[in-house]
Regions:
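Glycan-processing catalytic domains of CAZymes
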Residues: 1-245
Length: 245
């Protein structure tokens, strides 16, 4: 962990665009809860403490560690806090069914839209640490791993995502939480896409812009795609959706 933290300090933390909270670089560890499962509580805690020490020696006030997981569990959140994590995040929110362990599939995106705000309020009221609300862009992992034992979110729309952004702004105003995650942006093989694409155009980015940005007096810049300037988007031949197994 010291080697990893040293690399972070030398190559990432000192860049202007790197996210910092109270001056501390943010490190979001995917499936952070597995540190304890794989190495034990004492070793997991020592990993994070070693990274904190490296960051302080490099001139930073420390690291703001975030543990990412698939859903929220208050008891597990308390365990993560005891290891040294200060915040939680969810890779993608897939509706209240996921919270209760009801992994029904397929699942309509409308269900995700309708329950996001209530979920954020639930986590905010029960978590022993802060969290990053996840603004879900959908989920369909069939191109990567097929359909067996996976949740598939259907009928994803930029209009629905705009409603999620509106609720996120409402939640931020209610709680004072200033940090939100849009996620994912570019998981093309998992159907979680916020970047411009043929299905939604610029719709999802426009929703974020309109809800959280400050419109210039001259209006928003014109959206330009590669084809607008005579460029073709590269395409890989032979890609096709895996059949349902």
């Amino acid at each position: 962990m010291r080697a990893a933290a040293t690399y972070w300090c030398e190559h990432y933390f000192n860049t202007d665009e790197y996210l910092k909270i109270d001056g501390r670089p943010v490190v979001d560890i995917y499936t952070g809860y597995e540190l304890k499962a794989k190495f034990g509580e004492a070793e997991a805690r020592s990993f994070l403490e070693a990274a904190q020490d490296c960051a302080r020696k490099a001139g930073f006030p420390g690291i703001h560690f975030v543990a990412q997981r698939a859903n929220f569990d208050p008891a597990l959140a308390a365990e993560l806090a005891s290891l040294g994590f200060e915040r939680l995040s969810v890779y993608k929110y897939l509706s209240d069914a996921a919270r209760d362990g009801r992994w029904t599939s397929p699942r309509d995106f409308g269900q995700v839209v309708a329950t996001s705000l209530a979920h954020w309020r639930y986590v905010h009221g029960t978590s022993p640490v802060k969290f990053f609300p996840s603004l879900s862009t959908g989920y369909d992992p069939r191109p990567w791993i097929g359909a067996v034992n996976n949740v598939i979110v259907t009928n994803v729309t930029s209009r629905g995502f705009r409603r999620i952004c509106e609720d996120a702004r409402r939640f931020s105003d209610e709680t004072g939480e200033r940090y939100l995650l849009m996620g994912p942006l570019d998981e093309w093989g998992e159907g979680s896409i916020g970047y411009p694409n043929r299905q939604h155009g610029f719709g999802m980015l426009e929703a974020v812009r309109d809800m959280f940005g400050e419109k210039p007096a001259a209006g928003w810049p014109v959206n330009i795609a590669p084809e607008d300037v005579g460029l073709k988007c590269p395409r890989r031949k032979g890609l096709q959706l895996r059949p349902t197994r």
